Amino acid sequence: MAVGKNKRLSKGKKGVKKRTVDPFTRKDEYSVKAPSTFQTRDVGKTLVNRTSGLKNANDSLKGRIFEVSLADLQNDEDHAFRKVKLRVDEIQGKNCLTNFHGLDFTTDKLRSLVRKWQSLIEANVTVKTTDDYLLRLFAIAFTKRRPNQIKKTTYARSSQIRAIRKKMTEIMQREAASCSLAQLTTKLIPEVIGREIEKATQGIYPLQNVHIRKVKLLKSPKFDLGALLNLHGESTTDDKGHKVEREFKEQVLESV
């Protein structure tokens, strides 16, 4: 008889499966709250592993970024082509308090704006708000036909494009540098800056579809809990903020 391993003794019991544990039993659900700048405060829910040992659930949640359609935040389908980024800065009970982290256009909207027979003009500016948030704003605009124009094309000359771009950067710099991040958000929702650029450039070349297509947050100031709580109002459980009307207009300077 050959000396070797007894295969029968080494085998385990047949039919015994490894016990699987559902990972969702170790998770907790938290509500994501948008700032009171937006009409709808209740963004949704997020999951996180329950606090155990040295791993704190709050630390895992802080810094999370959520991308939400502005149409959902404002209950208005006209804003469906814009996406807002919200960053979790503080946890209060089972609520994640967020702050504005950026704005962007959907790809299909941007592609639908670009057409033949017109000039596309883009500008960007890096600006610091009054509460020390460093932002980069990207604007986009397109030329349109003048009244009673017969010519098919609406191409602007290079000198006109440079003049329009200069106006765009000046207006973006002025509007963003003179207000806080929350005030700038109220200007971005009804597209106040885009309308102001359109008015200011009428004398150079008429424009259409003028938008702040993207807002990028480059640097945030030191975290201030009081400022964040003020941004969310006195009650952090309130699901509604104040509505920003589309008809909101600011006084335009005569010298522009």
Curated annotation (Swiss-Prot):
Localization per record:
Cytoplasm
**Major location category of this protein:** cytoplasm
Task: List compositional bias (Basic residues) regions by residue number.
Answer: 1-18
Q: Which GO terms describe its molecular function?
A: structural constituent of ribosome
Read off the Pfam families from this record: Ribosomal_S3Ae
Question: Ribonucleoprotein among the record's keywords?
Answer: yes
User: Which residue positions does N-acetylalanine occur at?
Assistant: A2
Q: Please tell me whether the keyword Amino-acid biosynthesis is annotated for this protein.
A: no
Task: Supply the HAMAP family for this chain.
Answer: Ribosomal_eS1_euk (MF_03122)
| Name of the protein in its database record | Small ribosomal subunit protein eS1
Origin organism of this chain?
Aspergillus niger (strain ATCC MYA-4892 / CBS 513.88 / FGSC A1513)
What gene codes for this chain? Answer: rps1
